Amino acid sequence: LNTTALSGASLGQVYLATRNGQQVIVKVKRPGIEKVVEKDLKVLMKIIPFAMKFVDPNLRFSIIPIMKQFVESMHEELDYTKESDNLKTIKKNMEPYDNVVIPNVHDDYSTKNILTMEYIPGIKVTDIQSLDEKGIDRQQLVIDVHKVFFTMLLKHSIFHADPHPGNISVKDDGTLILYDFGMIGRINDETRIKLVRLYLGLIEKNPPRTVNAMDELGMLA
């Protein structure tokens, strides 16, 4: 295990290690982080009623559901077995698509506090110079990123909900690599159909259809 962290975040750190001659990624949760998070969440929940006074009245109704979702997401992120399950589910869902790869999990070296995964190196999606040096079509890359995430969102019941540049890399052949499945989202069929209507309205530049879809989603309440 290389004790110098490759990257770090508020909940844990990521290290590079070797197992049976192959490089792996080891994600380690920070000691005692559960108590810190629970304390912070309690403080946050106490602040919300006061903060609501300064929020637009039209937006107040959405604050509590958003906070409940945030608390649930934080608890999931603290349990690496749940992240492992999320990764495996999304990996299986995306297997038919050859423009994206997701690391395998090493179950025998993973626990609630440690997650060991296959190491798949790649180029950051924001590293324009390296992408150009490899001859990767950046316009096609943007299309592929949209396709991958919209496929998860509109076709499957679970999707990667943290698509920032640090969680998306590119192989030399242009294949996308997705990392970090601690934050995921779930969507039911009813909401998915409403989202499809919204996107169709936007694509067709049809204001009435778009507004109707937004109303169905509760975006105009």
Task: Please provide the spans of the model-predicted regions.
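Conserved catalytic cores of large enzyme domains
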Residues: 1-221
